[in-house]
From Swiss-Prot:
Domain KH-like stretches: 380-464
Reported function: GTPase that plays an essential role in the late steps of ribosome biogenesis.
InterPro entries: AAA+_ATPase, G_ENGA, GTP-bd, GTPase_Der, KH_dom-like, KH_dom-like_a/b, P-loop_NTPase, Small_GTP-bd
Residues that coordinate or bind GTP 2: 212-219, 259-263, 324-327
Family label: Belongs to the TRAFAC class TrmE-Era-EngA-EngB-Septin-like GTPase superfamily. EngA (Der) GTPase family.
Domain EngA-type G as annotated: residue spans: 3-166, 206-379
A GO term for molecular function: GTP binding
Ligand binding (GTP 1): 9-16, 56-60, 118-121
Protein's UniProt name: GTPase Der
Assigned keywords, A-Z: GTP-binding, Nucleotide-binding, Repeat, Ribosome biogenesis
NCBIfam families xref list: GTPase_EngA, small_GTP
Length: 494
């Protein structure tokens, strides 16, 4: 499982600055679900070799009562989800009563907590940090989040202990799925090699994550799938967050369901309260090959559904959408829901949408057709010759635009990765291509390769001009000839 890091501290100590630096974005997934606070932010982070999830908790105010309230409502929940806590303080402002109260709480928890003194740029860092030792924390790091100073060393120290654990968990998952994790993925394939690799991948179990907001029917759908197949269920705990991996077989195809809601026994299917864990959901997305988002037709698509889809899209996962509780809706309501889905899901127009009833089983069987289609699309290997040929066909049908009097020239294309498919196109002035033409190329590849259910990423690389930045050095005879010509020009002017 991907490690989880929680940022805790009072307001204005730089938690959001560090969060934005780690996630490289200001557009985080905000938890706005029933039972969760509105100001906890979750983001994907990558620094060096480390991939992790970071949680930015809101600030904790200075009064003792406020600390108790805020910690109970928000920060303790984030700490409970986290593997390690970064307790941030302001090196310029110095030690405060709120810092002392937070430290007292952190000393009582049984999780690694590291003191991070921020804003030490331009000042004597050791002198500014000295008073914070009285908080009684075992470890202290000095950083300047705004400029990135010390952040890499901090993350290395925090996450290196989890590397061995992650390797062990990855080995367990590989044993379950019979999947090998090659050190370096092969990108260049002949057409024969591509076909052989495609067949190998189709023999591996598909890792399918069922995600969605609380009470949309995830547990009902999971039990419907398992009940229909009469599969013997066993649990393989991932971490303390207890995502459950459930091997199953359907239509001679093996799957591993990643269940974020927890498999309920039949007698407990009618539970109305379902605990929702953002971290568990994000980790399930990271682990999956295909993500199945369950939406409640009676509530329509929500901003939280869009956030989950956005996270899956950014992770490059294949996507299938199941609109649950479709039975019993009137014709007019169904038409309205379909229009809303068309309007709001334009950014994932490649995803198949199914209208189902998990309770009665209507439409559930067809979900797996789309899951297999999406997995095939994401894992199909395509040779350089095929990708280049499709690119030539696209440019013949619709030429690239002119840029400053010169037409953009696309030379060749090759694979840059799989799951999701990445296509690298080389050419001249390709950074000048407008977004509309990039979308045209992406859609052309999608149609030509019959790719459905997975995002496609196209990367452009400028072909280097070998003479750029070089001067043409003349030979001795050329220099003598140039002098004679210059002399002749001067004599004529006289």
């Amino acid at each position: 499982m991907v490690p989880v890091v929680a940022l805790v501290g009072r307001p204005n100590v730089g938690k959001s600055t560090l969060f934005n630096r780690l996630t490289r974005t200001r557009d985080a997934l905000v938890a706005d679900f029933p039972g969760l606070t509105r100001d906890r932010k979750y983001g994907q982070a990558k620094l060096g070799e480390h991939e992790f999830i970071v949680i930015d908790t809101g600030g904790i105010d200075g009064s003792e009562e406020g600390v108790e309230t805020k910690m109970a409502q928000q920060s303790l929940a984030a700490i409970d989800e986290a593997d390690v806590v970064l307790f941030m303080v302001d090196g310029r402002a110095g030690l405060t009563v709120a810092d002392e109260a937070i430290a007292q709480h952190l000393r009582r928890i049984e999780k690694p907590a590291i003191l991070v003194v921020n804003k030490v740029d331009g000042i004597d860092a050791d002198a500014a940090s000295a008073e914070f030792w009285q908080l009684g924390m075992d470890q202290m790091y000095q950083i300047a989040a705004a400029h990135g100073r010390g952040v890499g060393a901090l993350i290395d120290r925090v996450l290196n202990p989890f590397a061995e654990q992650m390797e062990s968990e990855q080995a367990q998952l590989e044993d379950l799925t019979n999947e090998e994790d090659p050190e370096e993925e092969q990108l260049e394939y002949s057409e024969e090699e591509a076909e052989a690799e495609y067949k190998r991948l189709q023999d591996l179990p598909i890792k399918l994550a069922i995600i969605g907001r609380p009470n949309v029917g995830k547990s009902t759908l999971t039990n419907r799938i398992l009940g229909e197949e009469r599969v013997v269920v066993y649990d393989m705990p991932g971490t303390t967050r207890d995502s459950i991996y459930i091997p199953m077989k359907r239509d001679e195809r093996e799957y591993v369901l990643i269940d974020t809601a927890g498999v309920r026994r039949r007698k407990r299917i009618n539970e109305t309260v379902e605990k929702f864990s953002v971290v568990k959901t994000l980790q399930a997305i990271e682990d999956a090959n295909v993500v199945l988002l369950v939406v409640d037709a009676r509530e329509n698509i929500s901003d939280q559904d869009l956030s989950l889809l956005g996270f899956a899209l950014n992770s490059g996962r294949s996507i299938v959408i199941a609109v649950n509780k479709w039975d019993g809706l009137s014709f007019d309501v169904k038409e309205h829901v379909k229009k809303e889905l068309d309007r709001r899901l334009g950014f994932v127009d490649f995803a198949r949408i199914h209208f189902i009833s998990a309770l009665h089983g209507t439409g559930v069987g067809h979900l797996f057709e789309s899951v297999q289609e999406a997995y095939r699309s994401a894992t199909t290997r395509v040779g350089t010759s095929v990708l280049t040929r499709i690119m030539k066909m696209a440019t013949d049908d619709h030429q690239p635009p002119m840029v400053r009097g010169r037409r953009v020239k696309l030379k060749y294309a090759h694979a840059g990765g799989y799951n999701p498919p990445i296509i690298v196109i080389h050419g001249n002035q390709v950074n000048e291509l407008p977004d509309s033409y990039k979308r045209y190329l992406m859609n052309y590849y999608r149609k030509s390769l019959e790719i459905m259910g997975t995002p496609i990423r196209i990367q452009f690389q400028n072909s280097e001009n070998p003479f750029e930045g070089k001067t043409n050095k003349m030979t001795l005879s050329q220099e003598r000839q140039r002098k004679r010509l210059m002399s002749m020009v001067k004599n004529r002017r006289k």
